[in-house]
Amino acid sequence: MPRLFGTDGVRGLANGETITADLALRLAQAAAHVLGQDARDAGRRPVAVVARDPRVSGEFIAAAVAAGLASSGVDVFDAGVIPTPATAYLIADFDADFGVMISASHNPAPDNGIKFFAAGGRKLADELEDRIEAQLSQPVLLPTGADVGRIRRFADAEDRYVLHLLGTLQHRLDGIHVVLDCAHGAAAGISPEVSTDAGARVTVIGNDPDGMNINDRVGSTHLDLLAEAVLGHGADVGIAYDGDADRCLAVDHTGAIIDGDQIMAVLALSMARRGLLVERTLVATVMSNLGLRIAMAENDITVLQTRVGDRYVLEAMNEGGYSLGGEQSGHLVIAEHATTGDGILTGIQLLGEMAATGRSLHELASVMTVYPQVMINVRGVDRERVSDDAELNAAVARAEAELGDTGRILMRASGTEPMIRVMVEAADQATAERHAQELAALVTERLAI
């Protein structure tokens, strides 16, 4: 039987095979048993924060989760619609024992998900997820009478988070005109309030969630509308979030996209200049652009590479005590202020660097040359043999020798389907495409099932 928890909680079509009200209630009861144990051992009632993004299905799923927790003796504080990183922050700020976020992040509106955070607002370790999943098949012993939990509204949840974000800024944002694309998601309302209170001139798009329009041709996965708005309004910069605002990407005043690698480069240099980049080390995944590593090396900054996925970035940061990490997709973790990726925090720190230096985002991002990157997904192949095929390995070695220091090759097996991802970076697009196509064809020839 496949594992219920994926790389980012439990996710699927709401009211489909996985994400149902019944599962939400039972999963919450199982989580209450596992994550509330320390509180019960200390002789007190566990406390949990529950929140959601604006998807229409979030209402019944959050209600089922709250019912499952309260029926298990957990006091629930319902924060309503707030970003995922706000939930993580509030768990720590409120000293809750754990929390639950109902969201499917950048997925379309019909999907939804259930994600748990441990005490301190930290993502769950695999071991805790496995214990929760195992608990689903165990008998449920529920309290009665005065021992059941209460469900209360977390009245000042949004205000606490807004004040936290404003407190992270070193400079006001006066004089900066920013277009914010809130993806009709959890950033709506909050992000414009933060940027306005910090002094920026704000134009907003994607700020009218109706429960079904989240991520619909807006947000960090659809940047065309943001680029048009930046150019049309003559703005200095644009920032786009995904549905739960745990990531952001940007657009400079020319309409050019500034991805997560470029944002990391800008913030790493800023933090290094201020003595805040621990061990002058940036944590990034193997998918980050070669240009990021080159730019950081030129500034005496080490790039520590991890597997793909923000959870692996977080693990490396926590193990090494590092202060900044992230992904090309725009998931950035600024450890001084957050325990998980926070798009609104990342965005205002980027604006803060513009304000502090008086430089445009176009100028700041120019520290890094983005190498052309070509990715080909080769399906229907035996992913287990990718590292053992001698002819394929020889072809990769020849291509790497030709690229030298001006490119790289990455072959990565999918963890969920018979597919190999072939990624090639080179100094020019044509070279990257040529090597990627040649290697993809060889993968098909050698590893076809």
UniProtKB/Swiss-Prot annotation:
GO molecular function: magnesium ion binding; phosphoglucosamine mutase activity; phosphomannomutase activity
Residues with PTM Phosphoserine: 105
Entry EC number(s): 5.4.2.10
Organism from which the protein derives: Clavibacter sepedonicus
Keywords for the protein's UniProt record, in alphabetical order: Isomerase, Magnesium, Metal-binding, Phosphoprotein
Alphabetical GO biological process terms: carbohydrate metabolic process; peptidoglycan biosynthetic process; UDP-N-acetylglucosamine biosynthetic process
Co-factor binding comment: Binds 1 Mg(2+) ion per subunit.
Post-translational modification: Activated by phosphorylation.
Pfam families listed in its UniProt record: PGM_PMM_I, PGM_PMM_II, PGM_PMM_III, PGM_PMM_IV
Stored CDD domains: GlmM
PANTHER family with a match to the protein in the record: PHOSPHOGLUCOMUTASE (ALPHA-D-GLUCOSE-1,6-BISPHOSPHATE-DEPENDENT), PHOSPHOHEXOSE MUTASE
Class in the EC hierarchy, top level: isomerase
Claim: Protein biosynthesis is one of the keywords in the record: no
Name under which the protein is recorded: Phosphoglucosamine mutase
HAMAP family per record: GlmM_B (MF_01554_B)
